[in-house]
């Protein structure tokens, strides 16, 4: 018995040693020193939202505003919050839309011009909603040529699959995670069919059938994607008051913000 224990211990030590050799440890002396912003504001962001949306979307927006405000602790960046889209969007490195996209012609034209001139966008859930009555062809193309098809109901957690281990938004996330309860939109045509779209996260097939009242039975179900023609990312999460209860999903949100800002034509503010 004693010999067996010694053999087992020896095997474990060998395994740990092999794992240590496989991992590449880099000395702190060989890594670029930390960058402190000091009095410098690295970038400026705008949260554009509506107070005229359904309760579950108001709940998400209220929490989203609090979440992103906490990220400004230490004055690392400036965050403005408004229900109107400013006439001049050029000062903003990113516009965050938690619950709605512009609805009137003036704001739509303003946002389109901003994005076509290198602006940044982080959109959640209902901010991407569009159907046959929306009447904004550019925005539909901006999202990948898609419109709303269906959704699960009631809101429920969803098992997510990562589709990229190299993209900055997902490279430090687990291969799978459970997204807190939400209503998830499925789209037509499939965003993946557009060569300009890069899908980063999708709903795992094990979720189906999904829903009790409104049931989604299957099919490809992208959740997070980017349009390579713009500096943007769309995240399907954003319904109710549970979306910020998961650390992995919160990291996804931070990564999304950081990535969009880091690709600014003004230069990467995190590299200063």
List the model feature ranges, each with a label.
Residues 24-30, 36, 152-229, 233-234:
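Catalytic beta-strand/loop cores that center a nucleophilic Ser/Cys/Thr
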Residues 16-20:
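Sec/Tat signal peptide C-region and signal peptidase I cleavage site
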Residues 7-15:
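Bacterial N-terminal signal peptides
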Residues 52-53, 86, 102, 128-129, ...:
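Short, solvent-exposed loop/turn segments at secondary-structure junctions
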Residues 46-131:
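Helical hinge/lid and interdomain linker segments adjacent to catalytic or ligand-binding clefts
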Residues 1-5:
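Positively charged n-region of N-terminal signal peptides that target proteins for export
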Residues 101-175:
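A glycine-rich, often tryptophan-bearing local segment used as a flexible ligand/cofactor-contacting loop or short
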Residues 21-42, 67-70, 206-223, 227-272:
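Extracellular ligand-binding/catalytic regions of CAZymes and related secreted enzymes
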């Amino acid at each position: 018995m004693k010999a067996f224990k010694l053999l087992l211990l020896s095997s474990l030590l060998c395994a740990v040693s092999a794992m240590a050799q496989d991992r590449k440890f880099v000395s702190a002396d060989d890594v670029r020193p930390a960058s402190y912003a000091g009095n410098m504001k690295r970038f400026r962001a705008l949260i554009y939202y509506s107070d005229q949306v359904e309760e579950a979307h108001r709940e998400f927006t209220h929490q989203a505003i609090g979440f992103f405000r906490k990220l400004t602790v230490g004055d690392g960046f400036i965050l403005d919050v408004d229900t109107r889209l400013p006439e001049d969007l050029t000062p903003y490195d990113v516009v965050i839309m938690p619950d709605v996209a512009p609805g009137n012609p003036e704001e739509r034209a303003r946002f389109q011009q901003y994005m076509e001139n290198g602006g940044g966008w982080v959109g959640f859930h209902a901010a991407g909603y569009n159907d046959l009555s929306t009447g904004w062809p550019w925005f539909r193309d901006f999202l990948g040529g898609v419109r709303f098809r269906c959704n699960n109901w009631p809101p429920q957690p969803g098992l997510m699959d990562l589709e990229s281990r190299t993209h900055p938004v997902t490279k430090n996330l687990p291969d799978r995670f459970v997204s807190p309860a939400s209503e998830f939109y499925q789209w037509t045509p499939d965003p993946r069919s557009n060569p300009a779209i890069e899908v980063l996260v999708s709903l795992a097939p094990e979720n189906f059938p999904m829903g009790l009242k409104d049931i989604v039975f299957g099919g490809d179900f992208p959740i997070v994607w980017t349009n390579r023609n713009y500096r943007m990312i769309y995240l399907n999460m954003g319904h109710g008051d549970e979306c910020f209860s998961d650390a992995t999903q919160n990291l996804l949100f931070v990564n999304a913000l950081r990535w969009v800002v880091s690709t600014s034509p003004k230069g990467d503010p995190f590299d200063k």
